[in-house]
Amino acid sequence: MKLDGYTRLAAVVANPIKHSISPFIHNRAFEATATNGAYVAWEIEASDLAETVANIRRYQMFGINLSMPYKEQVIPYLDKLSDEARLIGAVNTVVNENGNLIGYNTDGKGFFKCLPSFTISGKKMTLLGAGGAAKSILAQAILDGVSQISVFVRSVSMEKTRPYLDKLQEQTGFKVDLCALEYVSELQARIAESDLLVNATSVGMDGQSSPVPENIVLPETLLVADIIYQPFETPFLKWARSQGNPAVNGLGMLLYQAAEAFQLWTGKEMPTEEIWQSLTEKYQ
């Protein structure tokens, strides 16, 4: 990697963040595209967020990525938000356009780009969970022309989830159906008519649990996706593959959301195939 007086910085800002694989992805991309850039991880306290954002301008950085807990907290310090960031109410990428700081959310785009030979336009989706990742997938699906979305959460989370879906409907005119995960017959009915089933919960990270009962029958053509990438194959994906369904883990989402950010910063396409090879070797 070339480092000199012209090197521009990008960083991921969160707490904790030292475990992040974003520096691995972006520094590979800078090198592969002959871009004079360097990408680092900044673990900061909330009291340092305003100063950190000011440093994007001060040091003429490409921009920053954000992870928890700063995706929402960063918004007041930005000049403008993209459509999807406004809908989601969270930013994972800040782009420095000649001193104007623009907030984007590339998670949803990254998710749909990682799905093999699949477009969401005109399709039906069942989504498990309603956290940050789920919101970005939801908003992007609506922007991309999805025809129906069924969101399943635990019954104790229904009340907390509804206001966001109501706000989404106000902003887009699109009504998302909210259902309780405990109603297995409803879950089966919605999955039976879906083209895409997504686990956007953390259930399965332990390598043992699954977000849905194993007696659910999947339609043959259903594509199944999990946002988890460690373990590389969750029990949920293993179960889907055992029924003969195509299944995708969350590593592709991580790579393609990074590729979207990289393009916004540099105007260049990230060599995703080359980096995917390195990532799978690292995490499989």
UniProtKB/Swiss-Prot annotation:
CDD domains the record matches: NAD_bind_Shikimate_DH
Catalytic activity annotation: shikimate + NADP(+) = 3-dehydroshikimate + NADPH + H(+)
GO function term, MF aspect, one: NADP binding
Family per similarity comment: Belongs to the shikimate dehydrogenase family.
Lineage, opening ranks: Bacteria, Bacillati, Bacillota, Bacilli, Lactobacillales
Pfam family, one: SDH_C
PANTHER family: BIFUNCTIONAL 3-DEHYDROQUINATE DEHYDRATASE_SHIKIMATE DEHYDROGENASE, CHLOROPLASTIC, SHIKIMATE DEHYDROGENASE
Enzyme class: oxidoreductase
Name of this chain's protein: Shikimate dehydrogenase (NADP(+))
Residue spans crossing the bilayer: none
Protein origin, superkingdom: Bacteria
Positions bound to shikimate: 20-22, 67, 92, 107, 229
Purpose of the protein: Involved in the biosynthesis of the chorismate, which leads to the biosynthesis of aromatic amino acids. Catalyzes the reversible NADPH linked reduction of 3-dehydroshikimate (DHSA) to yield shikimate (SA).
Pathway terms, separated by semicolons: Metabolic intermediate biosynthesis; chorismate biosynthesis; chorismate from D-erythrose 4-phosphate and phosphoenolpyruvate: step 4/7
Keyword Zinc-finger annotated: no
Positions of the catalytic residues: 71
HAMAP family linked: Shikimate_DH_AroE
Leader sequence segment: none
Organism: Streptococcus pneumoniae serotype 19F (strain G54)
